[in-house]
Design a protein with these regions (language model features):
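Short active-site oxyanion
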Residues: 16-18
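Catalytic core of pol beta-like nucleotidyltransferases
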Residues: 2-13, 23-193
Length: 193
């Protein structure tokens, strides 16, 4: 599936193309499929937003890091999956059919696609309504409002974990090496598998 502005339809010249494979699959198969499809993988990293989030494999398909594929390295919690629905998400068949999805921007603007474009409205103060419209829990909407308004106030605080994955290394090998020395990551993965 793709998520964000491509799914919502509010794209511009600076829009990223973000693809998510929502289930835990072997990343070597994903890399092989991308390369056989003519894509070049410019960089790879393991990222984890917080100690309680699933670690994810990120594959960047261009030097500017505007096109990426993400694969969870352990099963997502429901709130983590709702994160993508909050921003808007569509499947490949929906993308091919030019279907767009409602979703919210990082500036906390709800984008509702229309036949002629889209309608924009604020999220803050309408969390219950936005959750209902997007088919997500109020918990994810309030979490995103909290995180994104905090980001506006104090700036980005960064990721909990970022591990580069070199050519010739698999995500799974690098993750296992880190698990062996990181008790917090080990606990997170033990609770998911």
């Amino acid at each position: 599936m793709t998520h964000g502005s491509v799914a919502r339809g509010d794209i511009d010249d600076k829009s990223d193309v973000d693809v998510l494979i929502p289930s835990n699959v072997n990343t070597q198969l994903v890399e092989a499929a991308l390369e056989s499809g003519g894509f070049t993988i410019f960089s790879k990293e393991i990222a984890q937003a917080t100690p309680s989030h699933s670690p994810k494999a990120h594959l960047q398909l261009d030097a500017e890091q505007t096109t990426s594929v993400t694969v969870p390295l352990s099963p997502f919690r429901s709130l983590e999956l709702e994160f993508y629905a909050f921003g808007g998400k569509i499947t490949l068949p929906e993308l091919k059919s030019s279907i767009r999805s409602p979703g919210c921007t990082k500036k906390l603007i709800l984008i509702e696609p229309t036949a002629e474009g889209h309608f924009e409205s604020p999220v803050v103060g309408r969390e219950n309504e936005v959750a209902r419209l997007l088919g997500v829990s109020v918990a994810i909407v309030t979490e995103r409002v909290r995180v994104l308004t905090r980001r506006d106030t104090i700036g980005r605080t960064g990721m909990y974990l970022r591990i580069p994955v070199r050519d010739g290394e698999s995500f799974e090998e690098v993750l296992q090496a880190r698990v062996d020395s990181d008790p917090a990551l080990r606990r997170t993965l033990r609770g998911r598998n």
